[in-house]
């Protein structure tokens, strides 16, 4: 679908992304309708997908999506975990309607249902896993686009994009490529500058792995703080008292004289005696003796 235009040709960095994500690696089984997209077969039985055909079909799918006036009329579906995050990111970037997770039967055919929808275009991640929306789309004449592996059935699929739809990196990269081409054809982003959104945002991540990474990062931060507090704590600043300057060391240092504070003194002999210490105890003794004789 590039039409021989250099602008629409696949770039070298795109090929490197495809190879790094394993998009060209198919399965060991081959559907007879997918033979036209196969380049060769490896010695271990894995079929290699022709990436040139993948790019051409990617451009065709992007043109079909851009042809829909209302972006919300495009439904993107992924029932498998590896494509759910990519579907949500694609919908956020292009304005499509995502259905991540289990597809409720009757969404396209049962008008009584609360989740009833009438999309104009359907994009699925795996024709085998998403067979229910494909079947319902055939009932109501909805054109369909699908990411197809070498063993995927092409029944009810109008535009098949040959790629590896099993790997998490491959699925995320294909949705990222499709979103980028849609935005380029709409004129939202330029082809001269790379898209600032990274393909990593479209990759599926296992929740258990995320928890393990967060725990490891937290433990690493705690140990780093302990190490810094033990070994890299700033030492208290010590300031030495100023030393007196001595020009001649033989003379010695003169110690400054401190004046002695004078306190007023009193003459204890001049004060008169206030009490007679010998008279008072005898009076008390006679009283206590009298009481003692009464008890006896």
Swiss-Prot record:
It is found in: Cell membrane; Cytoplasm; Nucleus. Its main location: membrane. One of its GO terms (biological process) is ribosomal small subunit assembly. GO terms for molecular function: laminin binding; laminin receptor activity; structural constituent of ribosome. Residues 267-296 are annotated as: Disordered. It comes from Taeniopygia guttata. Belongs to the universal ribosomal protein uS2 family. The record marks 115-116, 133-134 as: Cleavage. This is Small ribosomal subunit protein uS2. The gene is RPSA.
């Amino acid at each position: 679908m590039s039409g021989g235009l250099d602008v629409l040709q696949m770039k070298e960095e795109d090929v490197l992304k495809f190879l790094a994500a394993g998009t060209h690696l198919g399965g060991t089984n081959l559907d007879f309708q997918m033979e036209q997209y196969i380049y060769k077969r490896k010695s271990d039985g894995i079929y290699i997908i022709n990436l040139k055909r993948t790019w051409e079909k990617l451009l065709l799918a992007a043109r079909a999506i851009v042809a829909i006036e209302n972006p919300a009329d495009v439904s993107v579906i992924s029932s498998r975990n590896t494509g759910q995050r990519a579907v949500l990111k694609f919908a956020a970037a292009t304005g499509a309607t995502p259905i991540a997770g289990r597809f409720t039967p009757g969404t396209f055919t049962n008008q009584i249902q609360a989740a009833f929808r009438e999309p104009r275009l359907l994009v699925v991640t795996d024709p085998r896993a998403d067979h229910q929306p494909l079947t319902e789309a055939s009932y109501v004449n909805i054109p369909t686009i699908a990411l197809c592996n070498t063993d995927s059935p092409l029944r009810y699929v109008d535009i098949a994009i040959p790629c590896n739809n099993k790997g998490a990196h491959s699925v995320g990269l294909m949705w990222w490529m499709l979103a980028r081409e849609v935005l380029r054809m709409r004129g939202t982003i330029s082809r001269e500058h790379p898209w600032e959104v990274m393909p990593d945002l479209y990759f599926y991540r296992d929740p258990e792995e995320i928890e393990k990474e967060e725990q490891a990062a937290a433990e690493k931060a705690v140990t780093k703080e302990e190490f810094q507090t033990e070994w890299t704590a700033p030492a208290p600043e010590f300031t030495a008292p100023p030393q007196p300057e001595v020009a001649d060391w033989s003379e010695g240092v003169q110690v400054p004289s401190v004046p002695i504070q004078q306190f007023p003194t009193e003459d204890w002999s001049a004060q008169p005696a206030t009490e007679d210490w010998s008279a008072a105890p005898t009076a008390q003794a006679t009283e206590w003796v009298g009481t003692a004789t009464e008890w006896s």
